[in-house]
Design a protein with these regions (language model features):
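Catalytic phosphate/metal-binding cores of nucleic-acid and nucleotide-processing enzymes, i.e., regions
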Residues: 1-108
């Protein structure tokens, strides 16, 4: 099955041990556009673990990127549905025209 892809590009971390915060700034690509998304992990400084903080911050950035991608796809879907309605309406109209012409021709 084919699908639209959200491609991970890069991730940088800002580590603030003194306040127990890790911020991941990740870049993703979708539809040729680069998205820069941040994710944050926090805990009390006494429980700070840099590796766990990085994993959580990156996972939150990825989750936010998926949400953003879903929003973009929903917008595209609405546009496509509007266009599909025009196509379906046109097909119905042309079918009616063909039926009308068939009826007209059969009168002779």
């Amino acid at each position: 099955m084919e699908r639209i892809k959200l491609t991970f590009m890069d991730c940088n971390y800002a580590i603030h041990k003194d306040c127990g915060v890790v911020v991941a700034t990740a870049k993703f690509k979708i539809f040729g556009e680069v998205l820069t998304i941040k994710g944050k992990a926090m805990c009390p400084p006494s429980m700070f673990d840099e590796n766990i903080g990085k994993k959580i911050a990156r996972a939150r950035a990825e989750r936010s990127a998926y949400i953003r991608a879903r929003q973009e796809i929903k917008i595209i879907k609405k546009r496509i549905e509007r266009q599909l309605n025009i196509v379906n309406s046109s097909l119905d109209f042309f079918n009616d025209c063909i039926t009308h012409q068939d009826d007209y021709i059969n009168e002779f």
